[in-house]
């Protein structure tokens, strides 16, 4: 028995705890429950990154849980089902409604097919549910069929004939009442929920892909997740908060890839005035369209204003509108080199005052700011990013962030002037997290300017590179496009540097992560050039999801995801996803290769995780409460 601490603050806390557990029996019952949970296998964690708005590929990886579902199907059915039969069952789990519609259209939806599929789904759900408490499983079961599914999950091989017939009759009734379609959907949903206990999204939900809004809609209903903001996420967060340069960048990024749908249909952003202004102001017929010309100039003017307001950003080399020679159609870069421009069409740029918007440009920007700050659908998504996201997260012996921790060449943490105070390392990332939240809650000018810097700044933990937007927009010679990276990206090949970073963030090895890991996205792993995602003797894992199709020729694959289960870690390298239609008709799954590491000699249990530490603390508190009841310090309440 643990004697309770009699200090006033602790005694006050125990009295509050006694409201939840008002009797000795309720306290020790909870102790028994919590102690039992500690001895369950740890839940499976799924790590994804750099989705970049690719909805179909993201949904397939989410549905197949990076192959976890197929692994369980293989384990449960072994040789009793053929390869094709397992494929059909998995496709039904991934896309239940669509698969049923296809089967019905092919007139193969016989009672026998339904009965077979229901029996197989129940077996998969029963196997997965065995890793959790019955209470947790009940909470995961879709409400409409909660009682029936709960009954079917807890059948046993040694049941008497009456119980066997009872459960058989439940399935028969489902078929007789034409409820099988809904019931299959509910079982498939439960299986996917039990297959992965928690999802970590390590940044960049948004970017050039047009499906980011649909992805966010799905995440709103996901059972358990956290997000580490990527540079593209922070860009959209800044735009939704009303930062003009972020808005101009969001428009430019999407208009260059013809992603009008996410702007106009998903979020209700009207582009009418911008398009009309561009057509009336800029010359057509060049390699750059009038619309892109207009948004480019708006962006570089707005960026220039921020850079001039914040000399501490150290970005004066990005002030290039004033370096244009309009007579020769050239620009002088910071290194003194002179380059021809791909266009000399700059009718709104005053050489004497190049960063000031014209009255027409100001009107358009004001209108766009109003559109972004009043877009309800967008704001629901950004609210979710804030409530479930952060710059970094420490979880189960892992340090998660999207980009980097800025470093000097000697491996020390790089300092940044943050509104007059210098910060480095964890302190700097904490500032970045704070200023991002201030931009949303308060929306002051400095905080909004920082949102733009977090998107693009060399010392931003979400960026970590010198972004040459102007050169890419106006100079044909690609030698000017080279973007230097923060020393972090080369120095973290060293295990000792990774150890220094993890130590800075208080990451200690745990039974569920014996070495500790830094888990990043942001930089595609170029397997064609011999790059590997597991670096620094396993201490750095780069899991850029590779969802963006434009990167596939460079990376050689369609990216990586990570699974951490009770048996260890598995890094999955994926081939490109084809289409949902092909998955349905041919039962095709994403082809993946598995790299197993950190394999455990014993299964890792809840007791080995952060949740286990919290549970042990709860048990300690309850033991103190139990002692207080038994010695009369706190009275029981019936």
Language-model region placement:
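Feature recognizes metal-dependent phosphohydrolase scaffolds
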Residues: 1-638
């Amino acid at each position: 028995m643990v004697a309770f601490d009699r200090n006033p603050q602790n005694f006050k806390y125990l009295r509050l705890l006694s409201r939840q557990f008002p009797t000795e029996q309720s306290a020790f019952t909870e102790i028994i429950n919590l102690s039992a949970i500690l001895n369950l296998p740890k839940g499976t964690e799924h790590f994804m990154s750099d989705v970049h708005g690719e909805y179909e590929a993201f949904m397939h990886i989410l549905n197949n849980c990076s192959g976890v579902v197929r692994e369980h199907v293989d384990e449960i059915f072994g040789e009793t089902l053929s390869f094709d039969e397992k494929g059909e069952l998995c496709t039904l789990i991934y896309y239940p409604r669509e698969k049923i519609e296809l089967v019905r259209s092919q007139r193969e939806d016989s009672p026998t097919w339904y009965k077979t599929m229901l029996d197989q789904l129940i077996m998969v759900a029963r196997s997965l549910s065995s890793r959790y408490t019955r209470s947790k499983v009940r909470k995961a079961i879709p409400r409409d069929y909660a009682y029936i599914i709960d009954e079917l999950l807890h059948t046993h091989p040694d049941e008497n004939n009456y119980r066997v017939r009872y459960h058989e009759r439940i399935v028969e009734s489902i078929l007789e009442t034409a409820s099988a379609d809904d019931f299959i959907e509910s079982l498939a949903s439960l299986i996917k929920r039990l297959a992965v206990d928690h999802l970590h999204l390590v940044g960049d939900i948004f970017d050039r892909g047009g499906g980011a809004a649909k992805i966010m809609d799905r995440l709103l209903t996901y059972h358990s997740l956290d997000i580490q903001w990527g540079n593209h996420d922070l860009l959209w967060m800044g735009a939704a908060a009303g930062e003009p340069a972020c808005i101009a960048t969001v428009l430019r990024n999407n208009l260059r890839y013809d992603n009008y749908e996410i702007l106009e249909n998903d979020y209700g952003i009207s582009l009418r005035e911008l398009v009309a202004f561009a057509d009336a102001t800029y010359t057509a017929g060049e390699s750059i369209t009038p619309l892109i010309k207009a948004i480019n100039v708006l962006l570089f003017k707005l960026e220039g204003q921020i850079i001039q307001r914040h000399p501490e950003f150290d970005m004066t080399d990005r002030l290039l509108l004033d370096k244009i020679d309009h007579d020769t159609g050239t620009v002088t870069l910071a290194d003194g080199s002179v380059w021809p421009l791909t266009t000399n069409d700059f009718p709104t740029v005053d050489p004497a005052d190049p960063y000031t918007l014209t009255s027409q440009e100001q009107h358009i920007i004001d209108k766009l700011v109003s559109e972004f700050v009043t877009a309800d659908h967008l704001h629901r998504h950004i609210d979710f990013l804030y409530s479930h996201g952060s710059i970094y997260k420490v979880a189960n012996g892992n340090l998660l962030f999207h980009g980097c921790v800025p470093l000097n060449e000697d491996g020390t943490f790089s300092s940044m002037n943050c509104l007059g105070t210098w910060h480095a390392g964890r302190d700097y990332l904490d500032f970045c997290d704070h200023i991002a939240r201030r931009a949303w809650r308060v929306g002051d000018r400095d905080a909004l300017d920082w949102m733009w810097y977090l998107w693009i700044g060399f010392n931003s933990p979400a960026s970590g590179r010198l972004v040459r937007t102007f050169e890419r927009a106006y100079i044909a010679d690609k030698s000017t496009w080279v973007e230097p990276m923060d020393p972090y990206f080369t120095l973290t090949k060293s295990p000792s540097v990774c150890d220094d970073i993890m130590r800075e963030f208080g990451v200690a090895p745990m039974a569920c992560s014996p070495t500790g890991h830094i888990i990043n996205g942001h930089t595609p792993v170029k397997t064609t050039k011999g790059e590997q995602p597991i670096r620094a003797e396993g201490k750095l894992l780069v899991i850029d999801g590779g969802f963006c199709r434009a990167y596939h020729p460079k990376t050689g694959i369609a990216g990586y995801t990570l699974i951490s289960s009770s048996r260890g870690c598995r890094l999955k390298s994926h081939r490109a996803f084809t289409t949902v239609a092909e998955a349905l008709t041919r039962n095709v799954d994403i082809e993946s290769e598995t790299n197993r590491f950190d394999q455990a000699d014993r299964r890792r249990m809840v007791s080995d995780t952060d949740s286990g530490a919290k549970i042990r603390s709860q048990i300690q508190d309850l033991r103190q409460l139990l002692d207080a009841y038994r010695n009369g310090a706190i009275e029981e309440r019936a």
